[in-house]
């Protein structure tokens, strides 16, 4: 999502990867 690194997604306002 916007503001997250490639391969990451936003969860609870934070970016998570993997």
UniProtKB/Swiss-Prot annotation:
Keyword list, A-Z: Amidation, Disulfide bond, Secreted, Toxin
Family: Belongs to the poneritoxin-Ae1 family.
Organism of this sequence: Anochetus emarginatus (Ant)
Keyword Secreted on entry: yes
Coiled coil, from the record: none
Expression tissues: Expressed by the venom gland.
Record localization: Secreted
Bilayer-crossing regions: none
GO cellular component, one term: extracellular region
Modified residues (Glycine amide): 18
Name recorded for this polypeptide: U1-poneritoxin-Ae1e
Cystine connections: 4-15, 8-17
Keyword Secreted attributed: yes
């Amino acid at each position: 999502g916007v503001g997250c690194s490639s391969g990451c997604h936003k969860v609870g306002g934070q970016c998570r990867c993997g």
